[in-house]
């Protein structure tokens, strides 16, 4: 990666020159939209980090304006900054309404559209503020003692629901006040760590009165309970919902702690009555995940996402509705044999929009509840849609692909026969960067697997691809293990930056991925070293038949389950590959079973504990642990891991690296003391990309060195 190919004109820093009052720091240097200049029309790590990333999207009550947030990153400052924008719903008159160094997020229209509420940390903690739609007249609405992490005003505007952390675990200092400098942590049950934190608090939903200027009478809906709502690590305000009458709150909660929490996905939807303070569990009979409730606009129904089986986090995510008068429940997405990833009621309460993945694309669908739950696909094309908001006769959604990050689109909410709904792009946040880049072609290929099935494989070609040349080629191994290889855009595992470095990328939707029916999705559980690995070999072997693929310069890369795949393939690839890269991968399955914090996942996907000698599924899983095949390792390998990763501990990468070195296999180890399962800090991200390509180039482009 040559630094001379890219010039930072301002390193993602800009002098403020935007609308709105912007707070006290309006005239200081800010992290904002980059004016990066790129030479050579090839994607670079710096170009990726220069891109603005669109976040929350909200439509005004009169459906004339859209408010949204954008995160900007500075590599020199090694941090980000969130700003807010407002535009007309046709995309015109787009203007930035905040311009400061505070973190502003979650724009929400309140007071019939006269004001925008937002989260802002200007006073040192994250509080709720309001301002005019042009950014003027900023005013702080809450002075809560602690950070507010999400919020929602009641439909009548008289109450506020917000999320904040409460202490659930006594610290060592609490137990031993005479030892204030002691650093030891005393643990008595499981779930003491989760994702990337030592668990000492839980998010709780709070409700307060709101008089238009201040909040009062704050009440913790889970007062005295050690449970979390929303659920860690990723749950937000979408896991709670107001009733249209403003007198009830539906919330998602798994009312378990310790070992019971660690082995179960059994969350439920609870309805809290503000008048009686009573709570009702409406999903008690279901044993899997129940999440993300939404009341219908007419208040007659409530909808939510539901998985059937306890402990199976990748179970079919179904859409259910319940008649609030009769209690009757209905599985309304039955005709869609894939996951409902997000949903939204139509204003007439007669249909529901949702997004879901099918055949490697995440599209928008509609379920007509008044017509026997008839399913209609509204959008088409090589894209992934994300997030949904209604705007008159249109749906406002974010959309991305393997060739472009998120932008906001307006989609007609009707389909005319075989003609899919029209989508109009409303934002062009990174057009100034895309205009300087040439993207590689993305192609869909269907390949016949060893068991006679058809597998969708994405192939991404270098820009200015020449079929008369031979290219080094990378097999991409997806994580999850049940995450789709759809039209995703990543700021780390970005296929276009791999293609820009003159690699062909082969990305198969191997066994275990959603979007191809339940049977295909479930085929990986208990079979980590089985058909999914044969699918990988099918993909790379089929592509190796092409004259433009240099089968003597094949690499294999992946993260999480993809990292496990790399470690496993390193002992089974029969000299196909010349270089491996494993990020946050599982090397020793027995240790992973004990080390990972969400035990339900290990129990389900591994089939059980390794000490269950009569459990054939579990024994097959652990017999396929990559560490058992190190004696067959003969190919250079780069191991990457974050030490704050509590899903798969960093000692897995260290052990793999040590084993390779002791075996005499060329190896390199990249460890991040301050990153989790992902790499989130700008300079760490740049280092990741540079190390990634330096390693691949060393072994797959030796003639060029």
Language-model-detected regions and their locations in the chain:
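C-terminal motif of bacterial Sec signal peptides marking the signal peptidase cleavage site
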Residues: 16-17
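Predominantly five- to eight-bladed beta-propeller fold
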Residues: 25-31, 82, 165-224, 252-268, ...
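Conserved beta-propeller blade repeats
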Residues: 51-66, 101-117, 138, 145-160, ...
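Short loop/turn segments that connect beta-strands within beta-propeller blades
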Residues: 88-92, 132-136, 210-213, 273-277, ...
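Beta-strand-rich domains and repeat architectures in extracellular enzymes and scaffolds
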Residues: 46-82
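Cap/lid segment of the alpha/beta-hydrolase catalytic domain
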Residues: 257, 420-421, 427-552, 559, ...
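Active-site-proximal cap/loop segments of hydrolase catalytic domains
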Residues: 494, 499, 507-705
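Short, solvent-exposed loop/turn segments at conserved positions within beta-propeller repeat blades
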Residues: 76-81, 121-126, 197-201, 260-267, ...
């Amino acid at each position: 990666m040559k630094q001379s190919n890219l010039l930072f004109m301002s390193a993602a820093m800009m002098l403020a020159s935007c609308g709105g009052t912007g707070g006290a720091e309006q005239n200081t240097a800010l992290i904002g939209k980059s004016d990066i200049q790129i030479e050579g029309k090839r994607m670079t790590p710096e170009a990726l980090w220069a891109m603005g990333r669109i976040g929350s999207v909200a439509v005004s009550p009169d459906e004339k304006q859209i408010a949204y947030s954008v995160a900007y990153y500075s590599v020199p400052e090694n941090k980000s900054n969130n700003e807010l924008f407002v535009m007309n719903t046709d995309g015109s008159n787009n203007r930035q309404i905040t311009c400061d160094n505070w973190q502003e997020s979650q724009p929400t229209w309140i007071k019939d559209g006269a004001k925008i509420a937002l989260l802002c940390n200007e006073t040192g903690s994250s509080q709720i503020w309001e301002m005019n739609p042009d950014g003027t007249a900023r005013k702080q609405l809450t002075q809560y003692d602690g950070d507010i992490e999400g919020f929602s005003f009641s439909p009548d505007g008289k109450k506020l629901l917000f999320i904040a952390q409460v202490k659930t675990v006594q610290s060592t200092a609490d137990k031993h006040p005479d030892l204030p400098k002691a650093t030891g942590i005393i643990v008595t049950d499981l779930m003491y760590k989760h994702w990337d934190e030592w668990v000492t608090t839980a998010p709780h939903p709070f409700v307060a009165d709101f008089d238009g200027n201040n909040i009062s009478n704050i009440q913790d809906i889970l007062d005295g309970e050690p449970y979390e709502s929303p659920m860690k690590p990723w749950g937000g305000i979408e896991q709670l919902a107001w009733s249209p009458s403003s007198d009830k709150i539906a919330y998602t909660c798994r009312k378990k702690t310790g070992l019971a929490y660690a082995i179960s996905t059994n969350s439920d939807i609870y309805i809290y009555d503000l008048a009686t303070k009573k709570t009702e569990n409406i999903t008690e009979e279901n044993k899997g995940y129940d999440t993300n409730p939404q009341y219908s606009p007419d208040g007659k129904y409530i909808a939510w996402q539901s998985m059937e089986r306890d402990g199976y986090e990748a179970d079919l995510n179904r859409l259910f509705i319940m008649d609030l008068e009769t209690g009757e429940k209905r599985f309304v997405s039955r005709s869609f044999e894939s996951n409902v990833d997000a949903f939204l009621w139509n204003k007439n309460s007669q249909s529901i929009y949702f997004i879901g993945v099918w055949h490697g694309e995440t599209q928008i669908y509609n379920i007509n509840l008044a017509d026997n739950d008839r399913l209609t696909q509204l959008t088409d094309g090589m894209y992934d849609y994300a997030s949904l908001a209604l705007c008159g006769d249109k749906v406002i959604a974010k959309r991305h692909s393997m060739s472009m990050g998120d932008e906001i689109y307006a989609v007609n909410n009707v389909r005319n026969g075989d003609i899919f709904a029209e989508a109009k792009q409303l934002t062009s946040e990174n057009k100034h960067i895309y205009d300087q880049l040439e993207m590689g072609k993305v192609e869909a290929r269907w390949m016949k697997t060893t068991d006679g099935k058809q597998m969708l494989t994405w192939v991404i070609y270098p820009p200015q691809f020449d079929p008369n040349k031979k290219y080094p080629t990378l097999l991409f191994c997806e994580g999850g293990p049940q995450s789709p290889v759809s039209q995703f855009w990543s700021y780390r595992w970005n296929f276009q930056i791999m293609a820009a470095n003159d690699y062909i990328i082969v990305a198969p939707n191997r066994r275990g991925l959603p979007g191809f029916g339940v049977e295909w999705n479930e085929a990986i559980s208990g079979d980590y070293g089985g058909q999914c690995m044969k699918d990988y070999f099918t993909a790379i072997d089929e592509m190796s038949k092409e004259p433009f693929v240099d089968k003597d310069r094949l690499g294999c890369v992946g993260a999480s389950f993809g990292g496990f795949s790399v470690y496993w393939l390193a002992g089974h690839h029969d000299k196909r590959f010349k270089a491996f890269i494993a990020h946050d991968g599982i090397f020793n399955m027995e240790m992973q079973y004990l080390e990972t914090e969400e035990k339900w996942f290990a129990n389900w996907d591994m089939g059980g504990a390794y000490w269950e000698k009569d459990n054939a599924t579990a024994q097959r899983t652990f017999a396929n642990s990559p560490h058992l095949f190190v004696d067959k390792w003969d190919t250079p390998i780069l191991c990457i891991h974050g030490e704050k990763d509590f899903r798969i501990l960093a000692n897995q990468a260290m052990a793999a690296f040590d084993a390779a070195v002791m075996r005499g296999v060329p190896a390199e180890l990249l460890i991040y003391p301050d990153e989790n399962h992902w790499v989130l800090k700008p300079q760490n991200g740049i280092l990741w990309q540079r190390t990634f390509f330096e390693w691949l180039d060393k072994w797959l482009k030796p003639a060029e060195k």
